[in-house]
């Protein structure tokens, strides 16, 4: 049947223009890797290709696993694999978070030195920034679902540029992002918050902006997981999920963001381990191994000329019935350019060489893939030796400007979902008695602390298992307060617990909330006026009653907690919308825009108001000298600009007797 949706029409062109705020720079440098961009590139590609032996050419088709958090024996094993097989690249992981950007850079230099003839493509999953893999050592921007709440899509372009800058600084060339899956299934165990939401237009626009920022910054972006992993309740890491819909449905929903991205220059696409009968009629046959899905749908219908990566071949979405190396042959047969993370490189290479000799694999097509890979390397600057400068790496990754960008992004993502009693801002707060209540966190939270900066507060906390006696006591104690500012904590990103978590029967519910927490929250909502802030996944609303005021903050990140408190008290405008439908009373697109004409003082980074953190930090030395010489026992310094406190520190003591700091 003719694929009418993908025909060039004025309507589609108008729709694309309406969807996407086109970036000011050229992000299409990787759009066509099937042809050389100029004579210089063609000469380099042809000369390198000609100099490679057949086995070395085959090595370019593989991207191997490497960890930055392992011991020297493991690193030597990776180096030996590089020397033996001459792979096209490495995909780096840091599952324990014990690896650091410095260790990553050191290993990158070591591995590149082992591949002097053709530098390696270094790839990572930085869907929401370098902090996704190097938590605590680099900046984590918000996850995609939180970004889906933003209405100013230019912020995603800026995020892409910043992540690209950080990637290049640490020697990463490929970012396996953006996630282009439309997440319209609340039970999805693997996509969820990694998606920009349930609306195809919003997903396409956000994914485009992030892609454009990455590629303008010199990093190859990768749209995943083709043809769309959003509408399933299974995880392709563990099984082969089915997407059982007709082609018309795929065209109008799942494939929609991929079409927008391929039309606008995305350089690579990752094929998913999904069974999609409308693309390949073979039963339980993954799209990652489907010539029909890749050659007909992706290459022909979507007119894609970039690199095609498989998803990780180690995943159980690749059926285990295949003989060793057979799936790798099938992946190349289907039209993938790069086999990502083969289960066993010895078996994979042996099977591919055998298939090539037997004629099962088309040599000409494989060499086309090799040349696409070489063109990508050339455009990424890998026609020259690669070495990462180790000095000042942490400082260069964690700049004040990057943190200020994150602050703007988080601020724009917070969504006021409900405010039935017009409470937001609390204009007459001097006449109100406030309490804060953190449910699911027994320690004083950042949110509670910042709420306390605006009015006298009594602070309360509960564990995840509230218990009858604590519930009764709190419900009674909180009666004396006019407003209870509730923060909900400990929410998982996925509906089911991770394999390492042992759920408590009858206690652990979806997204990690307990029956005890939900019952307590329900009673609290019935008996008190609450302002609820959810620091986690909005799909949790399906197990709640609608509160009078609901602020969706998406994450427990301290920056989100600070800004949530400021927003409740009228110091930070609210612009976010719901990226998904989470309850009948909280639908996609819902969000009350709130601009506070007379703002209370808020908190921000100096760079957010045109000042410099480094310049303000010079005060530390001046004050230390003052206190050290006895010119003063101590002091407090507060700097505010544009209604934002950007510096607030205390030094020394109140008196020379040093009785009180």
What function would you assign to each model-found segment?
Residues 149-172, 179-195, 200, 207, ...:
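A substrate-binding/cap region within the structured catalytic cores of diverse enzymes
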Residues 1-36:
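Bacterial Sec-dependent N-terminal signal peptides
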Residues 60-65, 88-93, 120-124, 128-130, ...:
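Structural recognition of the beta-strand scaffold that forms the well-ordered cores
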Residues 67-70, 96-99, 127-131, 180-184, ...:
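Solvent-exposed loop/turn segments at secondary-structure junctions
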Residues 53, 74-77, 99-116, 120, ...:
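Second-shell residues forming the walls of enzyme active-site clefts
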Residues 59, 80-100, 186-187, 262-285, ...:
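Short acidic, glycine-rich surface-loop motifs adjacent to enzyme active sites
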């Amino acid at each position: 049947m003719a694929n009418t949706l993908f025909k060039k029409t004025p309507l589609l062109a108008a729709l694309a223009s309406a969807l996407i705020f086109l970036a000011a720079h050229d992000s299409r440098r990787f759009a066509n890797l099937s042809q050389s961009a100029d004579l210089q590139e063609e000469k380099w590609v042809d000369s390198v290709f000609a100099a490679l032996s057949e086995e070395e050419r085959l090595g370019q088709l593989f991207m191997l696993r490497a960890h930055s958090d392992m011991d020297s024996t493991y690193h030597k094993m990776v180096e030996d694999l590089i020397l033996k097989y001459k792979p096209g690249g490495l995909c780096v992981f840091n599952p324990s978070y014990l690896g650091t950007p410095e260790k990553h850079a050191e290993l990158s230099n070591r591995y590149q030195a082992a591949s002097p003839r053709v530098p390696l493509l270094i790839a990572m999953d930085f869907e929401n920034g370098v902090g996704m893999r190097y938590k605590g050592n680099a900046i984590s921007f918000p996850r995609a679902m939180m970004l889906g709440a933003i209405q100013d899509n230019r912020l995603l372009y800026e995020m892409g540029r910043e992540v690209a800058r950080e990637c290049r600084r640490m020697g990463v060339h490929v970012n396996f992002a953006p996630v282009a899956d439309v997440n319209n299934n609340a039970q999805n165990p693997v996509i969820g918050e990694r998606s920009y939401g349930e609306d195809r237009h919003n997903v396409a626009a956000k994914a485009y902006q992030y892609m454009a920022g990455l590629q303008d910054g010199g990093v190859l972006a990768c749209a995943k997981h083709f043809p769309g992993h959003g509408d399933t309740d299974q995880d392709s890491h563990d099984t082969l999920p089915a997407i059982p819909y007709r082609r018309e449905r795929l065209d109008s929903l799942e494939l929609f963001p991929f079409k927008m991205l391929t039309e606008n220059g995305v350089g690579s696409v990752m094929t998913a381990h999904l069974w999609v009968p409308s693309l390949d009629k073979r039963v339980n046959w993954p799209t990652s191994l489907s010539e029909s899905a890749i050659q007909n749908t992706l290459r022909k219908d979507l007119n894609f000329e970039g690199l095609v990566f498989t998803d990780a071949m180690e995943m159980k979405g690749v059926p285990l019935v295949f003989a060793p190396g057979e799936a790798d042959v099938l992946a190349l047969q289907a039209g993938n350019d790069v086999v990502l993370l083969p289960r066993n490189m010895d078996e994979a290479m042996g099977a591919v060489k055998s298939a090539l000799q037997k004629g099962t694999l088309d040599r000409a097509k494989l060499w086309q893939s090799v040349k696409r890979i070489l063109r990508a390397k050339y455009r990424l600057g890998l026609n020259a030796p690669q070495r990462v400068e180790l000095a000042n790496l942490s400082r260069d990754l964690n700049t004040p400007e990057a943190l200020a960008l994150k602050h703007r992004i988080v601020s724009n993502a917070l969504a006021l979902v409900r405010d039935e009693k017009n409470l937001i801002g609390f204009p007459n707060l001097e006449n109100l008695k406030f309490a804060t209540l953190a449910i699911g966190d027994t320690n004083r939270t950042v949110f509670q602390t910042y709420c306390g900066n605006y009015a006298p507060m009594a602070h309360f906390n509960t564990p995840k298992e509230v218990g009858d006696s604590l519930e009764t006591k709190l419900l009674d104690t909180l009666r004396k307060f006019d407003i209870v500012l509730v923060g909900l904590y400990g929410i998982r990103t996925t509906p089911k617990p991770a394999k390492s978590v042992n759920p408590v029967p009858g206690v652990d519910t979806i997204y990690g909330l307990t029956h005890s927490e939900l019952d307590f929250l329900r009673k609290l909502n019935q008996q008190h006026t609450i302002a609820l802030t959810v620091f986690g996944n909005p799909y949790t609303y399906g197990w709640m009653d609608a509160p009078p005021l609901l602020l969706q903050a998406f994450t427990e990140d301290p920056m989100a907690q600070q800004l949530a408190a400021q927003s409740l008290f009228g110091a930070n405008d609210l612009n976010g919308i719901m990226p998904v439908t989470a309850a009948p009373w909280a639908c996609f697109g819902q969000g009350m825009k709130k601009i506070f004409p007379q703002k209370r003082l808020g908190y921000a980074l100096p760079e957010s108001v045109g000042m410099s953190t480094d310049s303000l930090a010079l005060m530390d030395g001046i004050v230390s000298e003052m206190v050290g010489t006895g010119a003063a026992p101590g002091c407090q310094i507060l700097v505010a600009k544009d209604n934002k406190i950007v510096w607030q520190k205390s030094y020394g003591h109140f008196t020379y007797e040093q009785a009180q700091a």
